[in-house]
Amino acid sequence: MIREEFFPTNVYGKDIKLNNHELAQNIFNWSAQDPGVNNTNVKSWHSTTDMASKPEYHPLVDELMIMCKDVFKEEWLDREPVLGNMWANINPKGGSNQPHIHPNSLFSGVYYVKSNPQAGRLRIHDPRPGAQIVMPNRRKGKPPKHLWRDANLDPFPGRIIMFPAWLWHCVEPNQSND
């Protein structure tokens, strides 16, 4: 039998070293001074989208741009990346983000400043609408990735995750007290 894969969806990850304690403190201070905005966030705080322009976040912006360049190279894109909107989310216990995409962007990403295993995983959804038409019964056990309909990515402090902006994703409710 010959098997080939077509139309894969690449999700990229990279672990970086930044002063996450300082980043977290800056974000908490920002949230205390700014009511934020309501987008996909549920029971949580979503900052305005001008985070990249604030000097205290430039070390993170620099790391994001390095990764963006690597992703663009991997994806055969013949252009330089431009960082558009950037914001912070704080999801307290019960906080989450509803399923959404990011229009007018090529890639989107997440950076985890602070997290733990119960803090709410990033869930990405199979982008193929036709794949949802029939959901056959499967054998017992964990099927191979090409048969998954959703993938749950665990949050780790210091991790960047980048994915196509058209990929539907959400954040599960934070079950921790942190």
Summary of predicted features, one role per range:
Residues 1-78:
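Non-heme Fe(II)/2-oxoglutarate
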